[in-house]
C-alpha cells in the first residue's frame, strides 16, 4: 500500500 495510507489527515 502507498505510504500516504499511513498518514491520517485532519478533516
From Swiss-Prot:
The keyword NADP does not apply. It is found in: Secreted. GO terms for biological process: neuropeptide signaling pathway. It comes from the Eukaryota. Its main location: secreted. Disulfide bonds: none annotated. Keywords: Neuropeptide, Secreted. The keyword Transport does not apply. GO terms for cellular component: extracellular region. Belongs to the FARP (FMRF amide related peptide) family. FMRFamides and FMRFamide-like peptides are neuropeptides. This is Extended FMRFamide-10. It comes from Namaquaphasma ookiepense.
